[in-house]
A protein has these predicted regions:
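Short, solvent-exposed cationic patches
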Residues: 555-557, 563-568, 679-692
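Structured C-terminal cap/extension of enzyme domains
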Residues: 637-691
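Acidic/aromatic-lined carbohydrate-recognition and catalytic surfaces
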Residues: 18-84, 88-91, 96-127, 140-378
Length: 692
């Protein structure tokens, strides 16, 4: 794309026709060029023996077209299922499409129909014609994810937390896998929830400096080793005494500062952990552990190898080969890191469920990846590398957003049988009872813009949503997991209908929920198939939101286009609408609170902020939502914004803010049991018994 030419100069068909893959268009292609490209694509489709991939449900009887050389019959057409059994496809439908001459070859089209009731899974369709065999992937998904109905009938509550910010006294300056289990156990023991929603754990750069944002990873399939708890690796016992002493000293340097009221600095933490991890890796493993490691490598296949090779290549290019013994290539080290991550995440999930959590860990899936990361290179064949994903301008970010992430290329992903999408989901769901998909509307369409250009130059590009959503449902069904789609933002209502059909629950946030009859949404108007919460990680904690920090911070950073006083006044009026609804429908029950109307009240005239926060969570707990989620920052009185969209590190310390209380002091997991507010909001967040 040329510097001055935005994607909004093109239609979606134009983008498909010019195959937006990195070509440098200095000006808009002529209409003749676009039409010729479109015709070329249509010809390519008509000369394709089988579709790129077929995705259907286990209740549909789906029709599909095959193409053979004119006059040549379809000799064989059959399905090979996952279990190696075979089913011939015999039902042919009428098709009056005339043959076409494409580059001197006459092609004909025939239509066949798949039978309904096919088993769920990943299968293969094979076509044989003129002694030539062709195949494509067939994916059969559930019509509806069964776990959704389980929680609609028996609603549960959970807690959301940013793992890096939630530390214990033994942490190395950042929350880690052991802290997940510790926090989950603490929450379960206090009746605070059946799941723990945490930020994406996707891997960042293989060595410092590393990206702070968990939503801009190097890969979405593999895990960030910065979360490894060094002391929980069995092979630490094999270290020589002097090396073990060195590792202990590294840990001490960070543990002593866990209560320092400073931002989280990932680079020194990761550098120290990598030093310790290399020592443990070189200490070796016993025969049993070595076999487990090799089994893991075999199971993960080419994807793990490609990722580890990318990491090793980055290391050698920047650091040289001196970090490894000659007989221990860096590739093995990076595969080993992923194995340790996998084991420790499994232990964290086991600890959560052993404590009584029904779901346990709820993983978070970022929208995309870093443009120069592992996935951008190893999955380049299914991405559109010269595009960037973001969001158009809206009321909360009036300049729009550029997330600096290359999007899936719709057709290339289908050509790959959606296997990169499947493999990523399987890895994430292996040790999680649920998954939240950030910006789930990206499974329908994504806002593309040329890289390094303004979000105002962008346009939406559509995806095969039934394929992407159906595969989510299939992999979640196999994992026994729930799926939450973050469906906030600009969308058409039918998209929510599709998600609901597949059993993908939506997201409802108290402050964003207006009633179709005016004012704030009433309890009974909330969706059942959703995760309802008071706040999100893109808003200040509720105490800060009530004080207007979501507006004053944007004003301080130059992100507010409208008048500050007008914005604050409009926000205050809407907060009054919401709080009046909370008051009207029992949110303040049991509180020493005597106000009868929030309208006309200044922010400091509405009573104790802790009471308001507690009431908001009590209200959400009584909605019919299948899942409700309480922010850990609210349970400790924090007011600090974790992430301010549309800003860089130089403007705001996004994703580096530690957990603090209302007084601004650091809070560790060890402190939670001694905090009255933690217990108060935990109790307010309890779901009422069915029928109450």
């Amino acid at each position: 794309m040329g510097v001055d030419l935005g994607l909004n100069d093109y239609s979606v068909d134009d983008l498909a026709a010019i195959d937006f893959d990195g070509a440098d268009y200095d000006k808009r292609p002529s209409e003749e060029t676009v039409q010729a490209a479109l015709q070329r694509r249509h010809d390519q489709e008509f000369s394709r023996p089988l579709p790129r991939c077929i995705v259907t449900t286990d209740t549909e009887s789906q029709a599909f077209n095959v193409h053979v050389r004119d006059g040549k019959p379809v000799d064989q057409l059959f399905i090979t299922f996952e279990n190696s059994s075979v089913l011939e496809i015999t039902e042919q439908l009428e098709n009056w499409e005339p043959p076409r001459d494409i580059d001197g070859v006459i092609w004909g089209e025939a239509t066949f129909q798949l039978p309904a009731g096919l088993p769920q899974g990943w299968h293969t369709i094979t076509l044989v014609s003129d002694n030539i065999s062709h195949s494509c992937t067939l994916v059969v998904t559930p019509t509806h994810l069964s776990t959704t109905d389980t929680y609609i009938n028996n609603p549960v509550a959970g807690v959301m937390a940013q793992l890096y910010s939630v530390r214990s006294s033994d942490s190395w300056g950042i929350g880690d896998f052991r802290d997940i289990g510790y926090l989950g156990e603490t929450l379960a023991n206090n009746g605070a929830g059946d799941f723990l929603l945490i930020n994406p754990l996707h891997a960042a750069e293989p060595f410092p400096p590393v990206e702070d944002s968990p939503y801009l990873p190097a890969t979405r399939r593999f895990i960030n080793p910065i979360y490894i708890r060094i002391e929980d690796i069995p092979e630490i016992e094999l270290l020589a005494e002097d090396v073990r002493t060195e590792v202990t000293e590294l840990a001490r340097q960070f543990r002593e500062h866990n209560r320092d009221n400073v931002q989280i600095e990932r680079d020194p933490i990761y550098e120290a952990k990598l030093r310790a991890l290399r020592e443990i890796f070189h200490a070796g493993r016993d025969e049993t552990r070595e076999q487990l490691f090799r089994d893991y490598i075999h199971r993960e296949g080419d994807g793990l190898t490609a990722f580890a090779e990318w990491c090793a290549k980055q290391e050698i290019a920047k650091l040289g080969t001196g970090n490894h013994a000659e007989d221990e290539p860096p590739v093995d080290f990076y595969m080993w890191l992923q194995w340790i991550c996998d084991q420790q995440l499994a232990a964290a999930q086991a600890r959560c469920t052993a404590a009584g959590m029904k779901i346990g860990i709820m993983a978070d899936l970022a929208v995309g990846v870093h443009p120069f990361g592992a996935d951008a290179e190893t999955l380049a064949n299914v991405l559109a590398p010269c595009a960037s994903v973001g969001a158009p301008p809206d009321n909360y970010n009036q300049y729009g957003q550029d997330w600096s992430q290359p999007p899936w290329h719709p057709e290339r992903l289908a050509e790959a049988g959606y296997k990169p999408w499947r493999d990523m989901l399987r890895t994430i769901l292996r040790h999680a009872g649920g998954i939240r998909i950030d910006h789930v509307l990206g499974l329908f369409r994504l806002y593309w813009m040329p890289r390094n250009q303004s979000p105002q130059t962008g346009t939406y590009v559509n995806y095969d949503f039934r394929a992407l959503v159906g595969i989510v449902a299939l992999e979640a069904e196999r994992a026994g997991a729930v799926v939450i789609g973050e469906d906030l933002g600009t969308f058409e209502p039918w998209m929510q209908d599709v998600l609901n059909q597949y059993g993908i629950m939506g997201t409802s946030v108290l402050w964003f929920e207006g009633s179709p009859y005016g004012g704030a949404r009433r309890l009974e108007e909330y969706r059942k198939a959703c995760l309802a919460s008071v706040t999100t990680h893109d808003l200040p904690p509720t105490a800060g939101f009530l004080r207007g920090k979501h507006i004053t911070l944007r004003n301080e950073l130059g992100l507010l286009k409208s008048n500050l006083d007008e914005e604050l006044n409009n926000d205050l009026n809407w907060q009054a609408e919401v709080l009046n609804r909370v008051l009207e429908q029992g949110g303040f029950a049991g509180e020493d609170f005597h106000m009868d109307n929030f309208h006309g009240r200044a922010r400091d005239e509405r009573g104790d902020v802790e009471v308001l926060v507690t009431a908001a969570h009590r209200f959400v707990a009584h909605t019919p939502a299948a899942l409700t989620c309480t922010a850990l920052v609210d349970m400790v009185g924090d007011e600090n914004v974790q992430n301010q969209p549309g800003t860089a590190k130089e403007q705001y310390p996004n994703w580096c803010v530690p957990l603090r209380n209302a007084q601004g002091n650091i809070v560790l997991i060890d402190d939670l049991n001694e905090m009255p507010l933690f217990h108060k909001i935990a109790e307010a967040s309890h779901r009422p018994a069915p029928g109450n």
